[in-house]
Swiss-Prot record:
Residues 164-227, 310-353 are annotated as: Disordered. Residues 37-93 are annotated as: PAI subdomain. Keywords: Developmental protein, Differentiation, DNA-binding, Homeobox, Neurogenesis, Nucleus, Paired box, Transcription, Transcription regulation, Wnt signaling pathway. GO terms for biological process: fibroblast growth factor receptor signaling pathway; hatching gland development; nervous system development; neural crest cell fate commitment; neural crest formation; positive regulation of DNA-templated transcription; regulation of transcription by RNA polymerase II; Wnt signaling pathway. Expressed in the dorsolateral ectoderm during early and mid-gastrula stages. At late-gastrula and neurula stages, expressed in the lateral neural plate, becoming progressively refined to the neural folds during convergence and extension. Expression is also restricted in the A/P axis, extending into the midbrain but excluded from the forebrain. This is Paired box protein Pax-3-B. Residues 34-160, 219-278 bind DNA. Residues 171-195 have a biased composition (Basic and acidic residues). PROSITE patterns: HOMEOBOX_1, HOMEOBOX_2, PAIRED_1, PAIRED_2. The keyword Transcription regulation applies.
Length: 483
């Protein structure tokens, strides 16, 4: 692997000896010790067998030199959990042998060591077990091979204070017997029974398995406080790339006067914050598309439909229907009885829409507008009752009830208001007497919902539609003060 000219990389991932295919399951490979598998880092492991001794030594040596466990995991191609477990075990017991935490290598505590432990605890009652263990090593009372584990020291402290000598002796004897039983069934004991140890492994098991390397105990690090200049530098780099490589991180660390580890952690936290913000923005955009997703208080006020002063001429209606871009689409109205019962009245409404109720369908429907009449028009299109503003805007207080006169209205997408027209259509006045004969019909016959096709509520041409005759039934329902 070649590097850039003039740059000396700190950490280079070794190139694998062979390119393994990236599959969902680990690839099986043949090793001298048996059938192995390849982990996600490219390292070979044998399921059920502990990590080889030389790799355990390498892990402890790298940790002794201050290399982080995540870097050790990538360089040695060992899983992060395995590295952390070996280092934690070595810190607690001083051993890198497999199964040392479970008591597979029992260390019988001598009376002299127990007396020292009691003395340390008596002099300093707040001393922890791991501090007592470190003091035993520091004072030379024990070495790495004979020092008791942290759990053994804790058991000694629990048993020595408040119990008699006979109970102590019996407890020690029971612990020793249990330790011997556990040793036979430990991983190390089972592997020794299965495979005869070679002379090299026997030598290395007692000498090489215990590297006398002190590890720094992990201290809780205080949170890093970034200055404004450092944050500006980091944000500029984050705008360029969310995943900087090792060279970019080191260069950025030099410019911002930070360590490469701090830069790496900052980018990790910044990516998490960016993903959270992106998800929240997507959710907000999606909820704006669905008005019912949030209560009305969380949604902006929807603009109400307004009416213009200019009315459509009867001759222009067939052209508007034939031209899809100019077609006025009306949603299908609801029956008067159910709507009237479900909607509250609002006498202070200044503008409203009327749904002309024709006994002959849309053949007698008129495009006209209704002037405001105070308390007589209680419907407000802005009432949030579960219906869309378009449907509510087309409903009246007495929708469909006879003997309610109304004037012509025009529906236009242009901004305007509800004002009385200057003149009434001549066709309405000509057919007024003709419509008076229909007063005897019932209210249920007055509701005639229109038919719409499935493609965007476009009106279907029917035989009953006579566009030049629009306005023949409007004047019958006009109020006396308007007529």
């Amino acid at each position: 692997m070649t590097s850039l000219a003039g740059a000396v990389p700190r950490m280079m991932r070794p190139c694998p000896g062979q390119n393994y295919p990236r599959t969902g399951f680990p690839l099986e490979v043949s090793t001298p010790l048996g059938q192995g598998r390849v982990n996600q880092l490219g390292g070979v492991f044998i399921n059920g067998r502990p990590l080889p001794n030389h790799i355990r030594h390498k892990i402890v040596e790298m940790a002794h030199h201050g290399i982080r466990p995540c870097v050790i995991s990538r360089q040695l191609r060992v899983s992060h959990g395995c590295v952390s477990k070996i280092l934690c075990r070595y810190q607690e017991t001083g051993s890198i042998r497999p199964g040392a935490i479970g008591g597979s290598k029992p260390k019988v505590t001598t009376p002299e060591v127990e007396k020292k432990i009691e003395e340390f605890k008596r002099d300093n009652p707040g001393m922890f077990s791991w501090e007592i263990r470190d003091k035993l090593l520091k004072d030379g009372v024990c070495d790495r091979n004979t020092v008791p584990s942290v759990s053994s020291i804790s058991r000694i402290l629990r048993s020595k204070f408040g119990k008699g000598d006979e109970e102590d002796m019996e407890l020690d004897r029971k612990e020793q017997e249990e330790s011997e039983k556990r040793a036979k069934h430990s991983i190390d004991g089972i592997l020794r029974e299965r495979a005869p140890a070679s002379p090299e492994s026997e030598e290395g098991s007692d000498i090489d398995s215990e590297p006398d390397l002190p590890l720094k105990r992990k201290q809780r690090r205080s949170r890093t406080t970034f200055t404004a200049e450092q944050l500006e530098e980091l944000e500029r780099a984050f705008e360029r790339t969310h995943y900087p490589d090792i060279y970019t991180r080191e260069e950025l660390a030099q410019r911002a006067k930070l360590t490469e580890a701090r830069v790496q952690v900052w980018f990790s936290n910044r990516r998490a914050r960016w993903r959270k913000q992106a998800g929240a923005n997507q959710l907000m955009a999606f909820n704006h598309l669905i008005p019912g997703a949030f209560p009305p208080t969380a949604m902006p006020a929807l603009p109400t439909y307004q009416l213009s002063e200019t009315s459509y001429q009867p001759t222009s209606i067939p052209q508007a229907v034939s031209d899809p871009s100019n077609t006025v689409h009306r949603p299908q109205p609801l029956p008067p009885s159910s709507v009237h019962q479900s909607l509250p009245s609002n006498p202070d409404s200044s503008s409203a829409y009327c749904l002309p109720s024709s006994r002959h369908g849309f053949s007698s429907y008129t495009d006209s507008f209704v002037p405001p009449s105070g308390p007589s028009n209680p419907m407000n299109p802005a009432i949030g009752n579960g219906l869309s503003p378009q449907v509510m805007g087309l409903l009246t207080n007495h929708g469909g009830v006879p003997h309610q006169p109304q004037t012509d209205y025009a529906l236009s997408p242009l901004t305007g208001g509800l004002e009385p027209p200057t003149a009434v259509s001549a066709s309405c006045s000509q057919r007024l007497e003709h419509m008076k004969s229909l007063d005897s019909l019932s209210t249920s016959q007055s509701y005639c919902p229109p038919t719409y096709s499935t493609s965007g509520y476009s009106m279907e041409p029917m035989t009953g539609y006579q566009y030049p005759q629009y306005g023949q039934s409007a004047f019958h329902y006009l109020k006396p003060d308007i007529a």
